[in-house]
Swiss-Prot record:
Keywords: ATP-binding, Nucleotide-binding. It holds the Pfam family CbiA. SUPFAM superfamilies: P-loop containing nucleoside triphosphate hydrolases (SSF52540). One of its GO terms (molecular function) is ATP hydrolysis activity. CDD domains: CooC1. ATP binds at G7, K8, G9, G10, V11, G12, K13, T14. This is Uncharacterized ATP-binding protein MJ0685. Gene3D superfamilies: P-loop containing nucleotide triphosphate hydrolases. To M.jannaschii MJ0084 and MJ0823.
Length: 253
């Protein structure tokens, strides 16, 4: 199952992604995490260090091609494939691939196509693939999120935020991006506003799969730079993310 997590910057997208990965890791360690947001701090929230990104490999290949220094007996595709496996961060709970800098001007279309092909093939070896996408709508307009089973849009607890989720859903339909399901998660919802959020979501035709409360413990972790991966399992928000994961896996929504 391929799950993409989207949302505007600052709504808690990466925090949700981290807790979702933690919840899924209780069921299996066959998880590929793809950090496709160049502005994301997903490795930090997961508590892992990343030495190289896919963007770094792309730039290295461009320089090798310009200098005609591709290793003997290797095609450019072979080189890319070997390097992708080298930079894959393997942990006990999941494997992580960080995309890094976006495709710059003047880079080779064939290289980018090869990269997508390699990553698509790699993804087939995992039970779950979780993609932390770019903030906003860019990944949809460029069609960089492909073959996704579930898109989860994270929004803040406001009518404007839910309106953004509605636009993401509309853009996906216009671009004919195929998702089996699109769900919305409202973040930092005050208890007294839960019913209002439910009504707004219904009014906009959104599948609101969960509402997460503001959480002091998460705010403290963020402030102190503690990886959210270390959040205790009895944390209220983590337990709600576990419930969301169950709904998605078991199609109980």
């Amino acid at each position: 199952m391929i799950i993409a997590v989207s949302g505007k910057g600052g709504v808690g997208k990466t925090a949700f992604t981290t807790l979702l990965i933690k919840a899924l890791s209780k069921k299996t360690n066959s998880i590929l995490v793809v950090d496709a947001d160049p502005d994301s701090n997903l490795p930090e929230t997961l508590g892992v260090e990343v030495e190289k990104t896919v963007g770094d490999i792309r730039e290295e290949l461009k320089k090798l091609v310009e200098r005609d220094e591709i290793p003997a007996g290797m095609t450019k595709l072979d080189y890319l494939r070997s390097k992708i496996f080298e930079i894959l961060v393997e942990t006990k709970y999941y494997d992580l691939l960080v995309m890094g800098r976006p495709e710059g001007s003047g880079c080779y279309c064939s290289v980018n196509n090869w990269l997508r092909q390699i990553i698509d093939n790699l993804a087939k070896d995992y039970e779950f693939v979780v993609i932390d996408t770019e903030a906003g709508l860019e990944h949809l307009s460029r069609r960089t999120t492909q073959n996704v089973d579930v898109m989860i849009v994270i929004t803040d607890a406001s009518k404007r935020g839910l309106g953004t989720a509605k636009r993401i859903k509309k853009l996906a339909n216009e671009l004919e991006v195929k998702f089996k399901d699109i769900y919305v998660v409202a973040n930092k919802v005050k208890p007294e506003y839960e019913e209002l959020i439910d009504n707004y979501a219904k009014e906009l035709g959104l599948n609101l799969i969960g509402k997460l409360p503001y959480n002091k413990e998460i705010a403290e972790y963020d402030l102190k730079g503690i990886p959210l991966w270390n959040l205790p399992e009895n944390n209220e928000v983590y337990k709600k993310v576990e419930e969301i994961a169950e709904k998605i896996i078991n199609k109980k929504f």
